[in-house]
Amino acid sequence: MPIYGDGYRNLNSHFHFHFQFRLNNFFRFIVHGQIKIMGSEVEVVEEIAFPKQIVGTTTKPLSLLGHGITDIEIHFLQIKLTAIGVYLEPAIVEHLQQWKGKPAKDLEEDDDFFDAIVSAPVEKVIRVVVIKEIKGSQYGVQLESAVRDRLAADDKYEEEEEAQLEKIVEFFQSIYLKTHSVLNFHFHFPPAARTPVAQIEFSSEGKEDAKMKVENGNVVEMIKKWYLGGSRGVSQATISSLANNLAIELSK
């Protein structure tokens, strides 16, 4: 039996404590708002634990079907910005039967496939955990710009969309996204609603939770496309993960 000595044991203990702190912190965040964890299995993304299943507005479980990061490269140095987890109802596969049996690589390169994910009438949660701290106002401007450009490209940018985006920018101006802060983008169909709504929930250690509702259907759609939009998605690692996991689900 190999002997590593006290140095190894101390390092291992430190890692276990550090990881357990993040795990407990994450679970504390995820029970805020309408979202609750389900079970104890997790997927670790950049030392951040994402539960394999959560429960949203209904008793239906949502499964972690995609995960990844956003990052930038400066002078050949990778800077990781956020970790992402995408939760979908298992019923999503019923709306993707056209792609049944297709390999993951084909799905990853097919924007129509991701458009079908975006438009499928199932509950979705996109969970974003901050790695590199950033002002909320900076994040809000990035989101607003990406959504506005997509709306304009589809000729859907009118006064109602502009007003909704202004409210989103105001919401993010009121928060600070320090490391381990959490944003939930929760998409669902309220009873009798014709279009989905989104709720943005913010949690951060030592700060009061904040949330806002997004009711403009066009803006809701483009927020989803920012994260789930195939080749135009903000995180290609997440897109690849979604393609791999959904290819497995569609092969069953």
Question: Model-found features: residue ranges?
Answer:
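Aromatic (phenylalanine/tyrosine) cluster motif
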Residues: 4, 8, 15-21, 26-29
